[in-house]
Amino acid sequence: MAALLVFFSVSLILLAVLFHKRKSSLSSRKRPPPSPLRLPVIGHFHLIGALSHRSFTSLSKRYGEVMLLHFGSAPVLVASSAAAAREIMKNQDVIFASRPRLSIFDRLMYSGKGVAFAPYGEHWRNARSMCMLQLLSAKRVQSFGGIREEETSAMIEKIRRSKPTTVVNLSEMFMALTNGVIHRAVLGRKGDGGDDFNRILIKVIKLLGSFNVGDYVPWLSWINRINGVDAEVEKVGTKLDGSMEGILRKYRRKKVGDDETNFVDTLLQFQRESKDTDPVEDDVIKALIFDMVSAGTDTTFAALEWTMAELIKNPRTLKTLQNEVREVSRNKGGITEDDVDKMPYLKAVSKEILRLHPPFAILLPRELTQDANMLGYDIPRGTVVLVNNWAISRDPSLWENPEEFRPERFLETSIDYKGLHFEMLPFGSGRRGCPGSTFAMALYELALSKLVNEFDFRLGNGDRAEDLDMTEAPGFVVHKKSPLLVLATPRQS
C-alpha cells in the first residue's frame, strides 16, 4: 500500500512538471505576422512585380496591414496602414531607425557615409545636423529665395519662347529646374558638375531602384554578373566618384573671398578644422554632397510632373487653381514666394498630389535593431522594414474616394504632409523623416504657382485630357512612364 501511494505521488509530481513545461512553452511561442506561402530559395520574389508598391498593396488586402515576406531567406516586414506606420516611426521609432546594408546602395552611396542611408548612430546624427544647419534649416531655405526666383523665371521664359503650336516637354523642364536650384544651393554655381554630372545622377537613381538578388540569396549573386548589373553599378560608381573628386579639387583651389560660402565650402572647412581631433574622410563629404543633390532633384521633379499631369487631366481643378493664383497676382508684375501663403487652394493641390502620387511610394527601407512586438505580432531583430506609403495614402478607411484627384478634401481637414499625421507620409516621419521637405516644397509651390499663372495648358496632337497616359515607371522615385508633352499658351491679359 505504501509503495502504491509513493507511485501515485511521483506520477502527480511528474504530470505537474510536464503541464508547467507545456504551459511555459505555449506562452513563449512567437506570433509572427501573416505571410503568404513561400517558395524554396526565392521566398516571395515571385509575388513582387515591377511596381512593388502595387504588388504589396494587393497582398496586404489579403494578408493584412502588417505582413511578413521573405526575399530569399531574408525576412521583410511590409507595413500598409497608418497604425503600423505610427508604431514604426513614432511609438517604437528608435529600434526601427536604422538602415539595412544593400550592395548597390553601398557602392553608389559611399557605404552609407551620408545621411539618407547611414545606419542609425552618432555618425548619422552629426551628418544630419550639419545638413540641417548649413542647407536645410528654415533660415537657410529662405536665403535661397533669390535662386528659386531666378531659376523659375528662367523656366517660364523658356516656355514662353516656344511657339504656341510647339509641344513643350514639361518633364525636361522640371528636371532642368530642380537641377539648377539644387546645384546652386549646394555647389554655389549652376554649372559646377556640368551635364555629365546630371547624366550620372539619372543613372544612379535608376540603379538604386534596381534589385540585387545577391543581397537576399547570396549564392545567386552571380546573376547580376551575368545580366550586367554589377558591371553597370561599378561603371557608374567610378564615374560618380571621379565627378565628386573633380568638385572637391575645384573647391580646394578656391581663394578666400572668391565666392559666397556654400555647402561644399562649409564641409571642407569642417574637414580642415577637425583633421587633428576627429578626421573626416573625403568619402563622407562626397556622400553628403550627393545625398543633398540627388534627394533634392528627383523628388521635386516627380511631384511637379504628376501635378501638371493631374491638372491637365482635370481641367476644372486647373481652372479653380488658376483663378486663385491669378486673383492674387492681379495688378502685380508676377508671383513671388510671399504670395504663396495667400493661396489655400494651391496648398490643397500640393497636399493632394503628395497623397495620390508620393515620390517615394515605398519609404526608404529600415532595419529593426532588436526584437519587437508590433500590433500583436512578434518581429525578430534584423528584419528589413518597408512602409508602403502608397497604400496608406489610398486607404479607403482613411480617405473618401481615395483614387480620385480632389484637392478640396484638404480644405476640410488639418491633415498635413509634415510627418505628424500618419494618413499620408510623403516625407516619412520621426528620426528618419526627410529633412529636406521645407526646401522641396518652397521650390515646388513657387514653380507651380508661376506656371498656372502664366500659361494655359492642353495636350498636343488633338489628344483628349481624359486620355492622358498616367502609367507609372518602375524606380526608386515614381515618375510618369512617358514624358509630359503639352501645348502652353501664354495667358491673355
From Swiss-Prot:
- Which keywords does this Swiss-Prot/TrEMBL entry list? Glycoprotein, Heme, Iron, Membrane, Metal-binding, Monooxygenase, Oxidoreductase, Signal-anchor, Transmembrane, Transmembrane helix
| E.C. code | 1.14.14.143
The region annotated as signal peptide is: none
Q: Which annotated residues bind heme?
A: 434
Query: What pathway does the annotation place this protein in?
Result: Secondary metabolite biosynthesis; terpenoid biosynthesis
> Disrupted gene: resulting phenotype?
Co-suppression of menthofuran synthase leads to a decrease of pulegone level and an increase of piperitone and piperitenone levels due to an increased pulegone reductase activity.
Q: Where do the TM regions start and end?
A: 2-19
- In Gene Ontology terms, what is one molecular function of this protein? heme binding
Q: What is the name of this protein?
A: (+)-menthofuran synthase
Q: Which organism is it from?
A: Mentha piperita (Peppermint)
